From Swiss-Prot:
Protein name, UniProt field: DNA gyrase inhibitor YacG
Function field: Inhibits all the catalytic activities of DNA gyrase by preventing its interaction with DNA. Acts by binding directly to the C-terminal domain of GyrB, which probably disrupts DNA binding by the gyrase.
Binding site for Zn(2+): C10, C13, C29, C33
Subunit and partners: Interacts with GyrB.
Organism from which the protein derives: Pectobacterium carotovorum subsp. carotovorum (strain PC1)
Similarity comment: Belongs to the DNA gyrase inhibitor YacG family.
């Protein structure tokens, strides 16, 4: 019985990453790539697409 090894590309640097429980940062190849990705989300360089163009001020207006 042969076990096939699954690999994916790191979303940050595109290096091959083995997809199993020994790859603690999967889908990233390293903690560095994981933190780079987190920083991109925090800086809003990455976002989930949406059809609604609602500003934050409309959703969170103060009421008294």
């Amino acid at each position: 019985m042969t076990t096939e090894i699954t690999t994916v590309k790191c979303p940050t640097c595109k290096q091959a990453v083995v997809w199993d429980e020994t790859s603690i940062y999967r889908p990233f190849c390293s903690k560095r790539c994981q933190l780079i990705d987190l920083g991109e989300w925090a800086d809003e360089e990455k976002r989930i697409p949406s059809d609604d163009m609602v500003s934050d001020s409309e959703d969170w207006s103060e009421t008294r």
